[in-house]
Structures are given as structure tokens and as C-alpha cells.
């Protein structure tokens, strides 16, 4: 670790503590040359897989796109922001747990539908109608029938 004061390359760790619910390590360091002290934070870099779209193109996972879709689905429904955050964290954890560098967009959509069905059935129908491109009332009826099973 380079000293931010004198740019020396040799520093020593004086103290280490877990912070952020154990997801980060706070380290107090001292430069062996100028003896200045400074604090660093370490955390694991969790990389999300890339998304393979239906047309075959690949793009980085976009958390804002996921949040936007979920917010549209739950609009004017009794679902809290905390519930949305929990659902999004569950989706991201599931995607990371695949261990794959790339995942199909269908997987992301299906995970979102699974989350919405637990949060709010009306929100699920809203999202499914757009995601599955329902074209007539019978498709809505089939989706509702699946919910009632």
C-alpha cells in the first residue's frame, strides 16, 4: 500500500476491524518512512455476470434497469422500498451464485417474476404482461389461473 502522504511503498497495519456488517475491513496503517497514519477500507469486489439479450448481444448487468422495471410493476401497490431492495439483492445474489460470467436475459426476467409473485400478485401480472408480451385477454386469464393454483 502506498503512503498517501509521501508515496512510500512500505506501510504497516496497526489495527484491523470489521465494519459494514462484516462486509468490509477497516485498517489503520502507518507509513514506515514519514510515520503518518491513514485509514483504508477493504471489501470484496463482487462482479455481476453480463447479460445475453434475446438478440444475442451482450451487455453489463444494469441494476437501475432492474429497479426501474420493478418500480413500474409495483407502482401504486402496497410494496415498500425495503421489500424492493430485498428482492433486488436476492436476484443479484442468485445471479452471482450461478458462477457464470454471462447469463441469459430470460433468467433475469424469470428471477424478477419469481420475486414479484412473492411481493404482490398484481405487480407480477403487470410485469408478466409486458415481459411475456400478452396479446389478448386469454393470456391474462391463463396467468391469473396459474396464480390461483
From Swiss-Prot:
Keyword vocabulary terms for this entry: ATP-binding, DNA-binding, Metal-binding, Nucleotide-binding, Repressor, Transcription, Transcription regulation, Zinc, Zinc-finger
GO molecular function, one term: DNA binding
UniProt cross-references to PROSITE patterns, sorted A to Z: ATP_CONE (PS51161)
Any single Pfam family the record assigns to this protein: Zn_ribbon_NrdR
Biological process per Gene Ontology, one example term: negative regulation of DNA-templated transcription
Database matches in InterPro entries: ATP-cone_dom (IPR005144), NrdR-like_N (IPR055173), RNR_NrdR-like (IPR003796)
CC cofactor: Zn(2+)
Domain of life of the organism encoding this protein: Bacteria
Record has Cytoplasm as a keyword: no
Transmembrane segments annotated in the record for this chain: none
Keyword Repressor: yes
Domain ATP-cone: 49-139
Cofactor binding note of this UniProt entry: Binds 1 zinc ion.
Mapped zinc finger ranges (unnamed): 3-34
Chain's role: Negatively regulates transcription of bacterial ribonucleotide reductase nrd genes and operons by binding to NrdR-boxes.
Homology family: Belongs to the NrdR family.
HAMAP family membership: NrdR
Protein name: Transcriptional repressor NrdR
Amino acid at each position: 500500500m502506498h503512503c498517501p502522504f509521501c508515496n512510500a511503498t512500505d506501510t504497516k497495519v496497526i489495527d484491523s476491524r470489521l465494519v459494514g456488517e462484516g462486509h468490509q475491513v477497516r485498517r489503520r496503517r502507518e507509513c514506515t518512512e514519514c510515520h503518518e497514519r491513514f485509514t483504508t477500507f477493504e471489501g470484496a469486489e463482487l462482479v455481476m455476470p453480463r447479460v445475453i439479450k434475446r438478440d444475442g448481444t451482450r451487455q453489463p448487468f444494469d441494476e437501475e434497469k432492474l429497479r426501474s422495471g420493478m418500480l413500474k410493476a409495483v407502482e401504486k401497490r402496497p410494496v415498500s422500498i425495503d421489500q424492493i431492495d430485498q428482492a433486488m439483492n436476492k436476484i443479484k445474489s442468485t445471479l452471482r451464485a450461478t458462477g457464470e460470467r454471462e447469463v441469459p436475459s430470460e433468467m433475469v426476467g424469470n428471477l424478477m417474476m419469481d420475486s414479484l409473485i412473492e411481493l404482490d400478485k398484481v405487480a407480477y401480472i403487470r410485469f408478466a404482461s409486458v415481459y411475456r408480451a400478452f396479446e389478448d385477454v386469454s393470456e391474462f386469464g391463463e396467468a391469473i389461473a396459474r396464480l390461483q393454483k
